[in-house]
A protein has these predicted regions:
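Polar/charged alpha-helical tracts
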Residues: 13, 35-37
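Acidic/charged, solvent-exposed loop-and-adjacent secondary-structure segments enriched in E/D, K/R, S/T
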Residues: 143-171
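Bacterial N-terminal signal peptides that target proteins for export
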Residues: 3-22
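N-terminal signal peptide c-region/cleavage motif recognized by signal peptidases
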Residues: 31-33
Length: 273
């Protein structure tokens, strides 16, 4: 069954409209140096004390899921409501994921990732980012390159590098496989590709919280996201992963511009696609 659109998005400054546009859950809108210019590992885990974890990454695929969300947002302090959906479809040694959210005035933004599943997690083959135009990143493992449709120079492909869609399922699968390895204060840094560059995304584990959501009451592990970019305009974002749903996201919250721009996604339903 082909995947329908879904969501992880929300916040890129659009030069033509000046609007905070839906783009990908905890955007790493970094202008940082490309992966070809760094020796950073594609996935790095550090303890709360800053020590690098030595154990190899363990990963467990979440079951196929369709997650529907209610969305409450603000743009320049003006409130709006909409809906969103995340689809995740593993099939044998392959996976497909897609996301989309409708934003008033702006329209829709769709992101998708397709690739294979390895013993340590996801191996993306292509990432597509579609709004007014379609852009992509192609992971060419044989040539050892990641290619960008927007004209950026190719960068080195390193096994374990993710894209802006797959990165969330990579994190979910890592925690699901070995939750004891990720106590409060743990930092997970993953190199993730957009349609123009590769940049590090860092998730910090903040602990378990009880959430009251449209789908009901549930326990979830809170992670906060940060990047090395200064272009996010005071972007603050958080992600809640539910152990009862194999650590899939049940809440996503983003704020920028002192809270004048805001997005809060809360799980409404969880079904099989």
């Amino acid at each position: 069954m082909p995947l329908r659109p879904s969501v992880f998005t929300i916040a890129q400054r659009n030069a033509k409209t000046g609007l905070s546009l839906a783009l990908g859950l905890l955007l790493g809108m970094s202008a940082a140096a490309s992966y070809a210019q760094t020796t950073t590992a594609p996935i790095e885990v550090r303890t709360a004390q800053g020590q690098r974890a030595k154990a190899p990454v363990a990963w467990r695929a979440p079951d196929a899921a369709r997650l529907q969300f209610t969305v409450q947002g603000k743009y320049k302090s003006m409130p709006y409501q909409t809906k969103a959906q995340i689809d995740w479809l593993p099939q044998g040694q392959r996976y497909e994921a897609a996301q989309e959210v409708q934003i008033p005035i702006v329209g829709s933004r769709r992101q998708s990732s397709v690739g294979t599943i390895g013993p340590n997690g996801l191996l993306p083959e292509i990432f597509i980012d579609r709004a007014r135009k379609e852009n992509s990143a192609t992971f060419d493992a044989k040539a050892g390159q990641i290619l960008f449709s927007r004209g950026s120079e190719p960068v080195a492909w390193v096994r374990g590098t993710q894209d802006r869609m797959s990165v969330f399922f990579q994190v979910a699968g890592m925690i699901a496989a070995a939750p004891q390895r990720y106590p409060q204060g743990t930092k997970i840094t993953i190199q993730a590709a957009s349609s123009s560059r590769v940049a590090p995304w860092t998730f910090t584990v903040r602990g378990t919280e009880n959430l009251q959501l449209p789908a009901g009451r549930m326990q979830a592990l809170k992670l906060e996201h940060s990047s090395d970019s200064s272009a996010e305009d005071n972007l603050q974002s958080a992600l809640w992963l539910a152990p009862g749903l194999q650590y899939l996201p049940v809440r996503i919250r983003m704020q920028e511009d002192g809270g004048r721009d805001e997005l809060d996604l809360k799980l409404q339903s969880h079904t099989k696609p």
